[in-house]
């Protein structure tokens, strides 16, 4: 279903890009009904469990429980995170594009960057630009890509590539962005001025939102760059 992103202005004049629709609901309206243990991992579409047997540096045999992706691409990378920077040519400061999305495992609404799994036959660049278009409606240009990073290596083998994309907000195709969300996706996009990003994450945390580690790591990096005068 196609949904239009409608621009609204908050009380502090920060520019927000909210997904508005009479059909789609707000992420905050979702709630957990039940959580039950799964006895057979075959019941799970996206995730499996493994018992890993390995030898430690002293040669002792040990076991490790691990969650695993069942959808890994042939390239060995599960997905992409898209660090999206909105660029203006009228003197407005750069902004970072973020999302609000209800995540059942943490029982709350997460602050995230656009992201998604790499489809079969896709490369990282294609997947990043496709996911950006589907989730936000924007068309952008890839600036850089990170090495493959692992989200929680003590728990799971899931990994991703962090792709930095710039969106030229003066281009006609970015004036009225149209998302292409799946029926089970309820995503609200908003933007924050890049230089205010670390402070805004603190405020969102205080409001009860869950911060995705990738988002907070970027905010912390900006804060450290300022603190230690890194150029």
Curated annotation (Swiss-Prot):
Membership in a protein family: Belongs to the Nudix hydrolase family. NudF subfamily.
Residues that coordinate or bind Mg(2+) 2: 131
Enzyme class: hydrolase
Any Gene Ontology biological process: ribose phosphate metabolic process
Documented EC number(s): 3.6.1.13
The keyword Transferase belongs to this UniProt entry's keyword annotation: no
Keyword Amino-acid biosynthesis: no
GO CC, alphabetical: cytoplasm; cytosol; mitochondrion; nucleus
UniProt binding sites for substrate: 46, 64-65, 69, 103, 117, 152
GO molecular function: ADP-ribose diphosphatase activity; metal ion binding
Domain annotation Nudix hydrolase: ranges: 75-214
Pfam families referenced in this protein's UniProt entry, alphabetically: NUDIX (PF00293)
Keywords: Acetylation, Hydrolase, Magnesium, Manganese, Metal-binding
Sequence motif Nudix box, residues: 116-137
Cofactor section: Mg(2+); Mn(2+)
Name under which the protein is recorded: ADP-ribose pyrophosphatase
Cofactor binding summary note: Binds 3 Mg(2+) ions per subunit. Can also accept Mn(2+) ions.
Coiled coil (residue ranges): none
Catalytic activity: ADP-D-ribose + H2O = D-ribose 5-phosphate + AMP + 2 H(+)
Gene3D superfamilies listed in its UniProt record: Nucleoside Triphosphate Pyrophosphohydrolase
Source superkingdom: Eukaryota
Note, other: Present with 7330 molecules/cell in log phase SD medium.
Residues the entry annotates as binding Mg(2+) 1: 115, 135
Residues annotated as binding Mg(2+) 3: 131, 135, 185
InterPro entries: NUDIX_hydrolase-like_dom_sf, NUDIX_hydrolase_CS, NUDIX_hydrolase_dom
């Amino acid at each position: 279903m196609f949904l239009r992103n409608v621009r609204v202005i908050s009380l502090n004049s920060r520019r927000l890009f909210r997904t508005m629709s009479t059909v789609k609901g707000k992420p905050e309206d979702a709630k957990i009904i039940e959580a039950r243990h799964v006895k057979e991992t075959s019941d799970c579409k996206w995730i499996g469990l493994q018992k890993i047997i390995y030898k430690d540096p002293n040669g002792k045999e040990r076991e490790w429980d691990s969650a695993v992706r069942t959808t890994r691409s042939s390239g060995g990378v599960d997905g992409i995170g898209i660090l999206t920077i909105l660029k203006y040519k009228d003197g407005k400061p750069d902004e970072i594009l973020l999302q609000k999305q209800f995540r059942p495992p943490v029982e709350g609404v997460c602050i995230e960057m656009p992201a998604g799994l790499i489809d079969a036959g896709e490369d990282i660049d294609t997947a990043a630009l496709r996911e950006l278009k589907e989730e936000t409606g924007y068309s952008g240009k890839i600036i850089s890509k990170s090495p493959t990073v692992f989200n929680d290596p003590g728990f799971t083998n899931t990994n991703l590539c962090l792709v930095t994309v710039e969106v030229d907000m003066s281009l006609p195709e970015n004036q009225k962005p149209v998302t292409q969300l799946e029926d089970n996706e309820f995503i609200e996009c908003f933007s924050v001025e890049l230089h205010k990003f670390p402070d805004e994450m603190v405020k969102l945390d205080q409001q009860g939102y869950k911060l995705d580690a990738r988002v907070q790591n970027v905010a912390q990096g900006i804060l450290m760059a300022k603190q230690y005068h890194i150029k």
